[in-house]
From Swiss-Prot:
Catalyzes the reductive methylation of 2'-deoxyuridine-5'-monophosphate (dUMP) to 2'-deoxythymidine-5'-monophosphate (dTMP) while utilizing 5,10-methylenetetrahydrofolate (mTHF) as the methyl donor and reductant in the reaction, yielding dihydrofolate (DHF) as a by-product. This enzymatic reaction provides an intracellular de novo source of dTMP, an essential precursor for DNA biosynthesis. This is Thymidylate synthase. The keyword Transferase applies. NCBIfam families: PRK01827.1-3 (NF002497), PRK01827.1-5 (NF002499), thym_sym (TIGR03284). It is found in: Cytoplasm.
Length: 264
């Protein structure tokens, strides 16, 4: 995927050295955008192998509204373990905000359900937005949302999605985020009777941690391979009804995995 390689090279060539919350140190740029035509293939990075199981199960977990890591652990996904408390709780993170964003009167808003209904009934709306950024609950969250707001757009029978990500760990996180929101776009398009359009990924602080510099150079030395295809194997009518087994990734032929440590 040339778009991702261009981002990595841009950070290495134009970035500034910044300190960060974890103490690792980063090279960073501010403000960057990538666009992926989902008709041309499913945007899974091919210059290193990604753990597809984690991508799918994490998104299903978000959609369920769950905020305890037990479901993830039961399905062999460990990516949230570092932030969970002893009981596995993370506080009101992504799934909570997507499915039960609190109102001042104590009730809540199911943002995802509302947006899907609006796509069906008012597809030209400019309010097809889901936000995970809730200033009143940030201190209760194990980790404030990095990918914090997404907006859908319908044109010519196709559904596009734009994500705003305030903080982007370019080596470990961004490939995962691209695939996750591309998958979400496919899922929402499926339940609303639309084709997929573009996924637009807008980054705020896009950075490479200094303990990932060698890995990024290795990845950039590899030639991208053709993108795989995503196939949804079952007719699903509601976003909550999707299961892991409903997705096939066809033709994914990546280069070997490149290990990198997570900065917590």
């Amino acid at each position: 995927m040339k778009q991702y390689h261009d981002l990595c090279r841009h950070i290495l060539d134009q970035g500034v050295v910044k300190e960060d919350r974890t103490g690792t140190g980063t090279t960073s740029v501010f403000g960057y955008q990538m666009r992926f035509n989902l008709q041309e293939g499913f945007p899974l990075i091919t210059t290193k192998k990604l753990h597809i199981r984690s991508i799918i199960h994490e998104l299903l977990w978000f959609i369920s509204g769950e905020t305890n890591v037990r479901y993830l652990q039961d399905n062999g996904v460990r990516i949230w373990n570092e932030w969970a408390d002893e009981e596995g709780n993370l506080g009101p993170v992504y799934g909570s905000q997507w499915r039960s964003f609190p109102r001042p009167d104590g009730s809540s808003v199911d943002q995802l359900a509302q947006v899907i209904e609006q796509i069906k009934t008012n597809p030209d709306s400019r309010r097809l937005i889901v936000s995970a950024w809730n200033p009143g609950q940030l201190e209760e969250m194990a980790l404030p949302p990095c990918h914090l707001l997404f907006q859908f757009y319908v044109a010519d029978g196709k559904l596009s999605c734009q994500l705003y990500q305030r903080s982007a760990d370019t080596f470990l996180g961004v490939p995962f985020n691209i695939a996750s929101y591309a998958l979400l776009t496919h899922m929402v398009a499926h339940v609303t009777g639309l084709e997929v359009g573009d996924f637009v990924h807008t980054l705020g602080d896009a950075h490479i941690y200094h303990n990932h510099l060698e890995q990024v150079e290795l990845q950039l030395s590899r030639d991208p391979r053709p993108l795989p295809k995503l196939n949804i194997v079952r007719d699903v009518s509601s976003i909550e009804s999707f299961r892991f087994e409903d997705f096939e990734i066809l033709g994914y032929d990546p280069h070997p995995h490149i290990k990198g440590e997570v900065s917590v």
